[in-house]
A protein has these predicted regions:
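Junction motif at the cytosolic side of a transmembrane helix
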Residues: 194, 198, 260-288
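Juxtamembrane membrane-interface segments at transmembrane alpha-helix termini
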Residues: 41-42, 217-225
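Alpha-helical membrane-protein architecture signal
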Residues: 3-11, 99, 103, 171-175
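Secretory targeting signals
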Residues: 31-80, 103, 107-197, 230-259
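Transmembrane helix boundary and interhelical loop/hinge segments in multi-pass membrane proteins
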Residues: 78-94
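Central hydrophobic cores of alpha-helical transmembrane segments
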Residues: 27-31, 203-216, 284-287
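Membrane-helix interface segments
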Residues: 97-99, 200-205
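Aromatic- and glycine-rich beta-strand/loop motifs that create alpha-glucan
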Residues: 1-26
Length: 288
């Protein structure tokens, strides 16, 4: 019965998200962004007569720090209402147990993270106008980029290495990127959930923004070992699938770290829900 209530609370929040026009406005912005990124790739395919693998292209684009920045900032916007304590939250919190209340929000973060990561990568793949039916061959264009060559005036925002193209199929690279992106997004959402119960919504959003831009700051200014501190950096195959760089985390290490981070944030959220003063203060502050 408790799990049924948790699922019911999660579905209520998902329905509220899908009824919110801002959600669709963000999706349209992402579509325009990925369409703009793919402009050089589309022209290159049209003028060369060669094709790009859509799945491999999406994985390569998400290996770029610019797409990682967009992914992180989009996650902050997506979870900016956590812990969703407005409107019906006070009623929900008094009618069900605290474990059920916080469990519904944790389940919501997990499901929305998978949906969010999958939608963005699919948008990226579809806007490339590449081949969707080919799942095993990277194609000449992506293999050329993986070997370190460019295409002159054609800007193809793909970051791939030979290790990726030699050891993974395009569909496997796409699936691994979806998995890591969903886990990183969930870690951000759970962190914002905990912080919103401790310091309020503004503090949670500020912390989320700092995590979102950390990968970009590391790329520009900080030593590369700092990638271990950025969960969004684990979504980039150019980092987690680069054995030549010993100070980069491997994808296995990144996967374990993301799972541990999510587990710790869930335990902290349950702990905060059982802190009488903190829980009641957070609920009433946002409600009134």
């Amino acid at each position: 019965m408790a799990m049924k209530r948790v699922g019911h609370l999660c579905l209520l929040q998902i329905k509220e998200l899908l009824r919110n026009p801002t959600f669709y406005a963000y999706l349209c912005l992402f579509f325009v962004y990925y369409h703009y990124l793919a402009d050089g790739t589309v022209r290159l395919q049209q003028e060369s007569g060669l094709w790009v693998n859509a799945w491999g292209y999406a994985a390569g684009v998400f290996s770029n720090y610019q797409s990682t920045l967009a992914l992180g900032l989009g996650a902050v916007m997506l979870f900016s209402d956590l812990p969703l304590v407005r409107e019906y939250a006070l009623f929900e919190a008094t009618r069900c147990s605290r474990n059920t209340w916080i469990g519904g929000r944790i389940l919501y973060v997990g499901m929305v993270s998978v949906l969010y990561a999958s939608l963005l990568l699919l948008l990226c793949a579809f806007t490339s106008r590449g081949r969707l039916m080919e799942t095993s061959e990277w194609g000449k264009l992506l293999n050329t980029l993986a070997n370190g060559y460019g295409f002159g005036e054609y800007h193809v925002p793909v970051s791939l290495s030979l290790e990726v193209t030699q050891n993974l199929t395009p569909l496997a690279a796409f699936g691994l990127t979806v998995l890591m992106s969903a886990l990183a997004t969930a870690a951000m959402g759970l962190m914002m959930l905990c912080l919103s119960l401790i310091v309020g919504r503004i503090g949670a959003i500020a912390a989320g923004c700092m995590v979102a831009v950390l990968d970009f700051v590391i790329y520009q200014k900080l030593p590369f070992w700092c990638y271990w501190l950025s969960p969004l950096s684990f979504t980039r195959l150019s980092i987690v699938y680069c054995p030549k760089m010993p100070y980069y985390p491997t994808w296995q290490q990144a996967l374990v770290l993301l799972l541990v981070c999510n587990a710790l944030c869930m335990l902290l959220a349950f702990g905060l829900a059982h802190c009488n003063r903190a829980f009641a203060k957070g609920i009433c502050k946002e409600q009134y």
